Curated annotation (Swiss-Prot):
Protein's name according to its UniProt entry: Histidinol-phosphate aminotransferase
Family label: Belongs to the class-II pyridoxal-phosphate-dependent aminotransferase family. Histidinol-phosphate aminotransferase subfamily.
Taxonomy, superkingdom: Bacteria
Keywords annotated in UniProt: Amino-acid biosynthesis, Aminotransferase, Histidine biosynthesis, Pyridoxal phosphate, Transferase
A GO BP entry: L-histidine biosynthetic process
Enzyme class: transferase
Pfam families xrefs: Aminotran_1_2
UniProt EC number: 2.6.1.9
Family annotation (InterPro entries): Aminotransferase_I/II_large, HisP_aminotrans, HistidinolP_aminotransfase, PyrdxlP-dep_Trfase, PyrdxlP-dep_Trfase_major, PyrdxlP-dep_Trfase_small
Residues with N6-(pyridoxal phosphate)lysine modification: 221
Organism placement in taxonomy: Bacteria, Pseudomonadati, Pseudomonadota, Alphaproteobacteria, Hyphomicrobiales
Reactions that this protein is recorded to catalyse: L-histidinol phosphate + 2-oxoglutarate = 3-(imidazol-4-yl)-2-oxopropyl phosphate + L-glutamate
Length: 365
């Protein structure tokens, strides 16, 4: 029997698998540490703005996210006309791919890159080219070596998810300088708010001074608005214009728009979250290293924990052990990291429970 057939390549895409979200169990507290969500929730100001917006759900949103683009512009010193907002930065990434990639094109990502990149690439008929990393960090030379006449885009998260590593901005500039002018460099700054290194830059200056670089960001992480699906991009005017031509007319809901605009102005809430993250990221790294586990140095709100390749000590066994205690981390088989788990920096209680749990796990005979 005849039936509709998906476009070529669609069925070759492995569906995205999010971190586990277990249902609470009676009599047991569950800590979800699998999706890099903030343990503090949104800013109280964002919650107030959200509640006010709910009173007007019968109205369509303002179609250009004008209020939010203005708030982002004030916060970062950007021209709002060069900002586009979306239902999470995932929508922005997919819009970029839909606008600039087609059959016969190639886009480059790295070994342990965010899985949305290859999905967006392949969904638009292009080929995903994987550049190897060095020390769980993007390797600029490896990326440049894989550029061909077919290359149209390079995806690069800085810092990277799920490794937590980053590139100094001199390396980002070197990458941009080494790419042909027609290749679009997509800098994903989802975790940039957590970085406090002197050699790190968000990327605004590079975007402002080139015609072939864009910067994406999200309100899902340090701002705690993951459920509202809200993100944004800063880019050259010609790229924003092209994307706006295919963007849905009401792609950002009013509650999301107004909550995000309030969240970005609550710098005290952001700073509190950042300080908590830095403290417990360092503590967890030390505690787990002392247990004999390897922790990749992280600048984000999560850590990458590597387990021995020995029966009784593997990542999958540790995952099952912690899950039985109500501690849910992220397995990373689909990120080519089968013997590692990613852990979100949680509350003090959650962090201590994971350290205690892994101490018990490693002490088993």
């Amino acid at each position: 029997m005849s039936r509709p057939v998906p476009n070529p390549g669609i069925l070759d895409i492995a569906p995205y698998t999010p971190g586990k979200s277990p249902a609470p169990e009676a009599g047991r507290k569950v800590f979800k540490l699998s999706a890099n969500e903030t343990p503090f929730g949104p800013s109280p100001k964002a919650m107030d703005a959200y509640r006010d917006a709910v009173a007007h759900l019968e109205d369509y949103p303002e179609g250009t996210s004008r209020v939010l683009r203005a708030a982002i512009g004030r916060a970062y010193g950007l021209d709002p006309d060069r900002i586009i907002c979306g239902a999470g930065s995932d929508e922005i990434l997919n819009l970029l791919a839909h606008t600039f990639l087609s059959h016969g094109d190639e886009a480059i990502s790295t070994t342990h890159a965010f899985l949305v990149y290859p999905i967006a690439t392949m969904a638009n008929g292009a080929t995903n080219i994987v550049a190897p990393e060095t020390g769980y960090t993007a390797d600029i030379d490896a990326i440049l070596e894989r550029v061909t006449p077919k290359t149209k885009m390079v995806w690069l998260a800085n810092p990277n998810n799920p490794t937590g590593t980053y590139l100094p901005f001199d390396e980002i500039r070197r990458l941009r300088a080494g790419l042909p002018p027609h290749v679009l460099l997509v800098l994903d700054g989802a975790y940039s708010d957590y970085v406090s290194r002197n050699d790190y830059e968000f990327g605004i200056e590079l975007v402002a001074t080139t015609e072939n670089t864009v910067l994406t960001h999200t309100f899902s992480k340090i701002h705690g608005l993951a459920a509202l699906r809200i993100g944004w991009m800063f880019g050259p005017a010609h790229i924003v214009d092209a994307m706006n031509r295919i963007r849905g007319p009401f792609n950002v809901s009013t509650p999301a728009m107004l909550a995000a605009a309030a969240a970005i102005e609550d710098t005290a809430h952001v700073q509190m979250t950042r300080m908590h993250t830095e403290k417990w990221r360092s503590w967890l790294t030390d505690e787990l290293t002392n247990l004999g586990l390897k922790v990749t140095p992280s600048v984000t709100n999560f850590i990458l924990i590597h387990f021995p390749d020995a029966r009784g000590r593997t990542a999958s066994e540790a995952d099952a052990f912690l899950t039985r205690r109500g501690l849910v981390l992220r397995a990373l088989d689909n990120y080519c990291l089968p013997n590692a788990l990613r852990m979100t920096i949680g509350t003090e209680e959650a962090n201590r429970l994971v350290a205690d749990g892994l101490r018990d796990f490693m002490a088993r005979t």
